[in-house]
Curated annotation (Swiss-Prot):
PANTHER family xref list: ORNITHINE CARBAMOYLTRANSFERASE, MITOCHONDRIAL (PTHR45753), ORNITHINE TRANSCARBAMYLASE, MITOCHONDRIAL (PTHR45753:SF3)
Residues engaged in binding L-ornithine: 165, 223, 227-228
Enzyme Commission designation: 2.1.3.3
UniProt pathway: Amino-acid biosynthesis; L-arginine biosynthesis; L-arginine from L-ornithine and carbamoyl phosphate: step 1/3
Compartments where located: Cytoplasm
Identification of the protein by name: Ornithine carbamoyltransferase
Catalytic activity: carbamoyl phosphate + L-ornithine = L-citrulline + phosphate + H(+)
PROSITE patterns: CARBAMOYLTRANSFERASE
Binding-site positions, carbamoyl phosphate: 56-59, 83, 107, 134-137, 263-264, 291
C-alpha cells in the first residue's frame, strides 16, 4: 500500500455517501457470516495496533474480537505500554508503530492527536474515540437503525443531553446521510459551533425544550451527562441536566414506533430512566453488538477496498 492509497477514518465526514452505503452493506454480510458461524479470514496475518489513552470495554472488545474473526491479530497498548505516555512526539510514535502493523485504532483525548498521528502513519488510522468525535459508534447506531427500521434518509433523529463527541458526529452524519437532527442541550452546555461545518447547518435544529426536540422523532438518543475527563463537573452537571433525562413522558412526544439508543455505559435515573432503556423501544444491546460488525466492515474496507464478491 502506498501513501497515496491510504485512507483514514478520523471523522464521520471522511467517507462519502457511497462509501457508507458499501460499508453498511458489508456490515450486514459480515454479521450474517458471524451468526452462521462461517469462517471468513480476508485479513489473514494482518495486525491491528490498538492504542488506548482512554479506557473502554466496548471499543477494545469489538476491535480485538473483530480483527481476530477476520483472521488477523490485535496488539493492545495503553499509555503504560508506549512511549506516548512518556512524552515521545506523536509524529515519532506514528512513524514507528505504522511500520510494524497493518492498521491502527486510537482512542485518545484531543482530535489533534489522532490527526497528527494519521498524517505521519504509513497505514490506515481509525478514530476509536476522541473528545470531539466518535464516528465508529455513530456508524454502529446508523446500522442498528437500518436493521430495525430501514434507511435513515429523510428520518428525524432527536439528541437530548450533552453537546459531546457523539452529538458532533451525529451532525456530520445528518448531512452525509440526509436525515434531520433535532437537538436540545441545557443552558451553559450549548453546541460549540466551531466543531460544526457550515454545510451542516440545514440538517440540524436546536431546541430549548427537550420534549420539543423529541417531537415526531424516529429515533431518540442520548449519552452520559459527564463524559470521561469531566468528572470534576459531575455534581454541577447533574443539577443542570435534571430536565434532560429521557423518560417515558419525553419518549411519548416521539413517533409511536421510535427507537431509543444510548452508546453506553448508562446511568439509569440520570440521563435515561430504567423504563426507557430497558423498555420495548430500546435497542441498546443491538447497538452495542453492532460495534463489532461495523468495525469489521470498516477494517476490511480500509485495508482491501471495495470487494467484488
Amino acid at each position: 500500500m502506498t501513501a497515496k492509497t491510504i485512507r483514514h477514518y478520523l471523522q464521520f465526514k471522511d467517507f462519502s455517501l457511497e462509501d457508507y452505503e458499501y460499508v453498511l452493506e458489508r456490515t450486514g454480510i459480515l454479521k450474517r457470516k458471524f451468526k452462521n458461524y462461517e469462517t471468513y479470514h480476508p485479513l489473514h496475518d494482518r495486525t491491528l495496533a490498538m492504542i488506548f489513552e482512554k479506557s473502554s470495554t466496548r471499543t477494545r472488545l469489538s476491535f480485538e474480537a473483530g480483527i481476530f474473526q477476520l483472521g488477523g491479530h490485535a496488539v493492545f497498548m495503553s499509555t503504560r505500554d508506549t512511549q506516548l505516555g512518556r512524552g515521545e512526539p506523536v509524529e515519532d510514535s506514528a512513524q514507528v508503530i505504522s511500520r510494524m502493523v497493518d492498521i491502527i485504532m486510537i482512542r485518545t483525548f484531543e482530535q489533534d492527536i489522532i490527526q497528527r498521528f494519521a498524517e505521519n502513519s504509513r497505514v490506515p488510522v481509525i478514530n476509536g474515540l476522541t473528545n470531539e468525535y466518535h464516528p465508529c459508534q455513530v456508524l454502529a447506531d446508523i446500522f442498528t437503525y437500518y436493521e430495525h427500521r430501514g434507511p435513515i434518509r429523510g428520518k428525524t433523529v432527536a439528541w437530548v443531553g450533552d453537546a459531546n463527541n457523539m452529538l458532533y458526529t451525529w451532525i456530520q452524519a445528518a448531512r452525509i446521510l440526509g436525515f434531520k437532527l433535532r437537538l436540545s442541550t441545557p443552558p451553559g452546555y450549548a453546541l460549540d459551533t466551531k466543531l460544526v461545518d457550515a454545510e451542516s447547518a440545514p440538517f440540524y435544529q436546536v431546541f430549548d425544550d427537550p420534549n420539543e426536540a423529541c417531537k415526531g422523532a424516529d429515533l431518540v438518543t442520548t449519552d452520559v451527562w459527564t463524559s470521561m475527563g469531566f468528572e470534576a463537573e459531575n455534581e454541577a452537571r447533574k443539577q443542570a441536566f435534571a430536565d434532560w433525562c429521557v423518560d417515558e413522558e419525553m419518549m411519548s412526544h416521539a413517533h409511536p414506533d421510535a427507537l431509543f439508543m444510548h452508546c453506553l455505559p448508562a446511568h439509569r435515573g440520570e440521563e435515561v430512566t430504567a423504563g426507557v432503556i430497558d423498555g420495548p423501544q430500546s435497542v441498546v444491546w443491538d447497538e452495542a453488538e453492532n460495534r463489532l460488525h461495523v468495525q469489521k466492515a470498516l477494517m476490511e474496507f480500509l485495508l482491501l477496498g471495495r470487494l467484488n464478491h
